Amino acid sequence: RRQRQMCIRDRVQGEIRWMKQHLGRLCRQKHVRTPLAQFAAKSYQSPSPYGNVLIMSPWNYPVLLTLEPLVDAIAAGNTAVVKPSAYAPVSANVLKDLLEECFPPEYVAVVLGGREENQALLQEKFDKIFSTGSVAVGKQVMESAARHLTPVTLELGGKSPCIVEKSSKIRLAARRIVFGKFINCGSNLLCWIT
């Protein structure tokens, strides 16, 4: 139970709290240096929403890796299409019910299904794509996004290296590595240096 709270509830609530605390600063217009050739002008960066964001989440953290990017997308003023993993159908259905209860479909839409639905979504034009999954899926997402010059954030699976330096406290490092490796039934990626 504590693992579930730590892996899902605490992290999502923490993301919401952080965003509420820092959103004003993140949305502010920032003064930036003006090129010398345009010395009489003033230059600014003005944050603006991407538009419609596709969020594709994995099976190993289906709730967390759907809601965390969704919090950020909503805070930035975007609409979102959420595609939970077909390999976590109970979580996907719960997310669909929850999000449909909280948001109108033109603001946050949830698409359930497998590879066929993924392929259909990737044929559509989105203004930003956030995808967590395998390297193979990441390549497909990147290829589809390239057709529309859509910016992409990929979090790809891989190895789980740990580097333990000579100066480390071996017992503490071992406990942390075991904890990190076996949290969420072992479907956790970690890359630590201790």
Regions found by a protein language model. Name each.
Residues 78, 83-85, 112, 132-133, ...:
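Short beta->alpha connector loops at strand-helix junctions that form conserved
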Residues 16, 77, 108, 129, ...:
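Residue-level signal for inorganic ion chemistry
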Residues 42-44, 110-127:
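A structured beta-alpha segment of the ubiquitous adenosine-cofactor-binding alpha/beta core
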Residues 32-39, 110-113, 176-177:
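Short gly/ser/thr-rich secondary-structure transition/capping motifs
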Residues 1, 18, 25-32, 171:
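Short, structured beta/alpha segment
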Residues 103, 136-194:
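ALDH superfamily catalytic-core signature
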Residues 3-8:
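Short, small-residue-biased leader/transition segments that mark boundaries at the very start
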Residues 34-103, 149, 171:
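Conserved small-residue-rich beta-alpha loop and adjacent elements
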